[in-house]
Amino acid sequence: MRINPTTSSPGVPALEKKNLGRIAQIIGPVLDVAFPPGKMPNIYNALVVKGRDTVGQQINVTCEVQQLLGNNRVRAVAMSATDGLMRGMEVIDTGAPLSVPVGGATLGRIFNVLGEPIDNLGPVDTRTTSPIHRSAPAFIQLDTKLSIFETGIKVVDLLAPYRRGGKIGLFGGAGVGKTVLIMELINNIAKAHGGVSVFGGVGERTREGNDLYMEMKESGVINEQNIAESKVALVYGQMNEPPGARMRVGLTALTMAEYFRDVNEQDVLLFIDNIFRFVQAGSEVSALLGRMPSAVGYQPTLSTEMGSLQERITSTKEGSITSIQAVYVPADDLTDPAPATTFAHLDATTVLSRGLAAKGIYPAVDPLDSTSTMLQPRIVGEEHYETAQRVRQTLQRYKELQDIIAILGLDELSEEDRLTVARARKIERFLSQPFFVAEVFTGSPGKYVGLAETIRGFKLILSGELDGLPEQAFYLVGNIDEATAKAMNLEMENKLKK
């Protein structure tokens, strides 16, 4: 891995006025810069504009070269607002791509696309920085072994298991528990795998980013007393920022994650919220650069841009980056080029259901809609595969019977169907689980359930051994032993009431 040790501020290497240009034209967030003959910067080089605007305010804008126009001119996209820039202003070619701080110093902090801290907690140690543009790991470096990434969350591990070094799409609207699920995964990877997480907020609402940060501090994922003990680094490029920043913020987060994987040899969890906004920003930049749009107005380079980001998210022999990406589907059209291109890269999908959230079943992961390429007997083993399939069949049958139950009631069902409904309701409740990060809100201690325990619990429910237990005993418990203990407590309480 190429690490550039510098003592400069993040974002750009140490500035020496070797190669100077002048602004020739400004079109919104796009600048045309003229350089002396033979001194043209390379594509993706960072350019810095420093100076003062008309009212004497200090200006410091970083841009990235996107096109060489000919006649000693380049076209660059700004990473921050271009207000106050004027034609003729001096532009410094840094001679290298954007570089951002990496390593332990980034944990517990919030950064912008340039790797500058934006949380008012002082400067960050920038002795180790890394360029945001890198090629994907070579074939020989990849770890081709298929292994399950255990999350400790029953519904995920059993029905839609994550691949170590894989990519997972997280589908869900507002208020169904996406943030809590993300925080629990960050917490569990730190405890069970000794890993760290990087969160890339790509084109999201500033309010949501702030809420996530506050909730992480409240739940202990970010340790305010000892910031180095934190388990996550946050990188934000919000909705109000120029398209250049939103297009590159995902790469900034990925670069930080790659350092933990390649140098620290850790398992890393990379969250991208929202991957659609990455495509959207690329589409805006493409239009600003004057490229001919492709289908539905998207950029012609859509697949290439997506591929260059996604191919860097992988397992190597040193460690792994497992990525969880929130996917917004425009107008619920799964054939839209943006989500359709994303699906090609995903190993698993976790779909959050508003119906389950309304029932109070958390995590509200839909067991029938969520899928995984890992759920094959040769990967997970016969026992896991058989249990998952039987759980799905039971829940599917319950779904089919719900209309009959609503019209005619349970009594009109056959004995076999009544048994299926009873077991399905127990399974549905047993798929819920108390989270560590929700302890501060719910008061019930969080539970991490190993895969073997999860399979054992569902096998016992399916076998009929627990048919005599009340269904509320299975609600918000960890393993199956806790459910039987809860059933005994409920029985004792009922006897005392009588």
UniProtKB/Swiss-Prot annotation:
It is found in: Plastid, Chloroplast thylakoid membrane. It comes from Morus indica. This is ATP synthase subunit beta, chloroplastic. It is an enzyme of class 7 (translocase). Belongs to the ATPase alpha/beta chains family. GO terms for molecular function: ATP binding; ATP hydrolysis activity; proton-transporting ATP synthase activity, rotational mechanism. F-type ATPases have 2 components, CF(1) - the catalytic core - and CF(0) - the membrane proton channel. CF(1) has five subunits: alpha(3), beta(3), gamma(1), delta(1), epsilon(1). CF(0) has four main subunits: a(1), b(1), b'(1) and c(9-12). The keyword Repeat does not apply. Keywords: ATP synthesis, ATP-binding, CF(1), Chloroplast, Hydrogen ion transport, Ion transport, Membrane, Nucleotide-binding, Plastid, Thylakoid, Translocase, Transport. ATP binds at residues 172-179. The keyword Chloroplast applies. Its EC number is 7.1.2.2.
